[in-house]
Amino acid sequence: MTTKPPLPPFTEQTAIEKIRMAEDAWNSRDPDKIVLVYTENTKWRNRNEFPIGRNQVHALLTRKWQKELNYRLIKELWAYTDNRIAVRFAYEWHDDSGQYYRSYGNENWQFNEQGLMEYRHASINDLMIDESERKFHWELGRRPDDHPGLSDLGL
């Protein structure tokens, strides 16, 4: 059976590792890769969508990155226990007209014994920003290790 370490029960350090792995995966914007960290029958609430299973999650992510261009994400630990992690995040993107946004949100994750995510509940709000207000300027892909996190940026 496939495992995705770190495995529950989580410590503060392993929760932070799991979060950074998720951030890196989402910053790849590769739905084929991303869905592999979820159970086959994963259940999500993402904004006003409720996908079930990897295929529906893949479709959601594909649509997401067709709309949210030049996507850059930072996640940060909020809380953890046994097999659950709470995360806060922000990401910046622009639409096809060039309008920039910073999206703020919270996620609640639950993992199975193999470290695959069973449940993901996400609440997200979009804030229209000027390009000059952007704070996430690294090259597309993984956030550099020396780039400030959300708290460091005052977010």
PLM feature segments, named:
Residues T14, K18, W26, Y38, ...:
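Bulky hydrophobic/aromatic packing residues
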Residues M1-E40, L150-L155:
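Short, low-complexity N-terminal intrinsically disordered segments enriched in polar/charged residues
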Residues T42-K43, D126:
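Short secondary-structure capping/turn micro-motifs that flank functional sites
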Residues K43-W65:
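Short solvent-exposed beta->alpha transition segments
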Residues T2-F10, A59-L155:
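A beta-strand edge to alpha-helix "cap/lid" segment located at domain peripheries
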